Amino acid sequence: MLDALSYGALLYDCDRDWSQYPIHWESELTLAADLVFAASAGLADHLSPCSGNIALIPNGGNHPMFSRDDLSRPLPMLDLEGPVLGWAGAVSADLDLAPLLYTARAHPDWNFLLLGAADPANPLLDRVRACPNVIVRQLDSLLELPDYLAWCDVCLNLLRERDNGLDIVPSRIYEYLSTGHPVVTMLWPDQVEHFPDVIYGAHSPESFCRLCEQALAEAPGWVSGRRRNYGRQAAWSHRAAEVDRILSTAGF
């Protein structure tokens, strides 16, 4: 395909693992690229045999949208009593819902929001839906998401089997940080949390539940400013400025 295109320079932006495709596809693209952007150190290391010109540009988030303090409480949340803990993202077939299911059953007085399209093939989805304190809701527009997250007491990050072994920080995390709310995430057995000073990292459903309890007991404003600052540093405008600087330095 590249042979059929006319271009002055070739840039490859690698933001995910493509191991499900023939490896020579990405290898040939990386070899041909004048400059490669990688979203994580792991991806950069993976691509390094094929390029000596790789720049690390992590994912980012829309900080201005998720950091606003004037967002309205969505109608479906008006009647909720008690703490609200929310997950933002698709409930895919390989999303591990076990930590959420365990915590929802342990705390029937808490509310859990799953904000995204739900795949019926997920093996725990029916059991999660059966919990009276869990709401699975597909949003009509992503523009609604900041309103929902603004009124969550804790933001939740769950694991997808396809991401096992990857070190890519999803944009979801930066959106969570931009709200300033406590964040509780599941971690793989050998995974190191990227933001250990502001995110609670769990390795089992039981520890996930305990850390949700700690997050809800967190003193207001304790580290919310630090979380927002991490979100601000990862704003897409900052990422774009860094890309522009790298391109200018490289002479593109």
Role assignments for model-derived ranges:
Residues M77-L95, L100-A104:
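Conserved donor-binding/catalytic core segment of Leloir-type glycosyltransferases
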Residues G42, G60, D69:
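Carbohydrate-associated surface elements
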Residues D17-V36, L43:
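Membrane-proximal helix-turn-helix segments that form the acceptor-binding/catalytic region
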Residues L95, L143, D147-Y148, C155-L177, ...:
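Nucleotide-sugar-dependent
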